[in-house]
Amino acid sequence: MKILLTGFDPFGGEPINPAQEAVERVNNNINGAEIIKITIPTVMTKSVEAIDKTIQEHNPDIVISVGQAGGRFDITPERVAINIDDFRIKDNEGNQVIDTIIKEDGEPAYFSKLPVKAMVKHMNENKIPASVSNTAGTFVCNHVMYGILYMIDKKYPNIRGGFIHIPYTTSQVIDKKNTPFMSLEEIVKGLELAIEACIIYKEDVKEIGGEIS
């Protein structure tokens, strides 16, 4: 089995991106699966193009993209991506699209092809805080998640794919009072556990994971 794991480069004025840092530190082999790791640019079109190129080169069974969501308390596998770009800030090439459809021939939304509740369960059972997220935002993270699932829908039907958001890491919150964070070591462990769950569970578990609002 091959698993493609991607992390973004720094964006939004941050000197590092814990997604990139954590992905680089994930084990190269997990439960017998080869982990292929790449850094993708925080740029709307080029990010998805880089993933597509790597899929064609390596033919992975699973694609997992990882991004930072500063302000979140835990690791959050994303349930759904929506067909809209609405950038609050510019991406790393100055693009700031507003209320723009990502793919005219795509679905209004795509649900993750990963066992998101099983991933959360496996992380929590191993003392890593995690929960299911029902919004990947409207920036490049959602764009990438939607792009992965669009490609699965249109040309890679045998691949499973999805997205995981992670919090700030320790060094990023020194000047951000009362901001949640997680150590890089915990993030790496969480990602490895999430990958394990994707290998173990072909279908998701039935457990409470919803939100009131």
From Swiss-Prot:
Paired cysteines (S-S): none
Pfam family, one: Peptidase_C15
Primary role: Removes 5-oxoproline from various penultimate amino acid residues except L-proline.
Known EC number: 3.4.19.3
Similarity field: Belongs to the peptidase C15 family.
Active site: residue positions: E78, C141, H165
Quaternary organization: Homotetramer.
GO molecular function terms attached to this record: pyroglutamyl-peptidase activity
Cellular component aspect of the GO annotation: cytosol
InterPro entries: Peptidase_C15 (IPR000816), Peptidase_C15-like (IPR016125), Peptidase_C15-like_sf (IPR036440), PGP-I_bact-type (IPR029762), PGPEP1_Cys_AS (IPR033694), PGPEP1_Glu_AS (IPR033693)
Catalytic class of the enzyme: hydrolase
Subcellular location(s) of the protein: Cytoplasm
Reaction catalysis annotation: Release of an N-terminal pyroglutamyl group from a polypeptide, the second amino acid generally not being Pro
This protein's name: Pyrrolidone-carboxylate peptidase
Keywords: Cytoplasm, Hydrolase, Protease, Thiol protease
GO terms of biological process kind: proteolysis
Primary residence: cytoplasm
